[in-house]
């Protein structure tokens, strides 16, 4: 515990909060260009082929982003919108690609949680 004199000489340091998505530079989303689209395997207890893309952002960073949903139309040079949000079982993947924005198509035949996957509302079934 510092004395009053010590506090007068040197004030307390503020605890700085570290950003979880530094490549976005305090923006909600960033535009980028896919440099590589590939699949990778998750950490130990899980098993799958997760779809990811390496994206060069307008902020100058090159990040690995997760492509959510079933199926996608992304390839090299696709323009994508990237948001924050990590994937727990993929080390180094701290960003998500926004479905239904720019070159990324929404998920086809999606009826639940459509807004998260860029899917339009289906037409009412004919009676």
From Swiss-Prot:
The modification 3-methylthioaspartic acid is found at residue 89. GO terms for cellular component: small ribosomal subunit. Gene3D superfamilies: Nucleic acid-binding proteins (2.40.50.140). InterPro entries: NA-bd_OB-fold, Ribosomal_uS12, Ribosomal_uS12_bac. Pfam families: Ribosom_S12_S23. Keywords: Methylation, Ribonucleoprotein, Ribosomal protein, RNA-binding, rRNA-binding, tRNA-binding. GO terms for biological process: translation. GO terms for molecular function: rRNA binding; structural constituent of ribosome; tRNA binding. The keyword Amino-acid biosynthesis does not apply. PROSITE patterns: RIBOSOMAL_S12. With S4 and S5 plays an important role in translational accuracy. Interacts with and stabilizes bases of the 16S rRNA that are involved in tRNA selection in the A site and with the mRNA backbone. Located at the interface of the 30S and 50S subunits, it traverses the body of the 30S subunit contacting proteins on the other side and probably holding the rRNA structure together. The combined cluster of proteins S8, S12 and S17 appears to hold together the shoulder and platform of the 30S subunit. NCBIfam families: rpsL_bact (TIGR00981). Part of the 30S ribosomal subunit. Contacts proteins S8 and S17. May interact with IF1 in the 30S initiation complex. Belongs to the universal ribosomal protein uS12 family. This is Small ribosomal subunit protein uS12. It comes from Campylobacter lari (strain RM2100 / D67 / ATCC BAA-1060). The gene is rpsL.
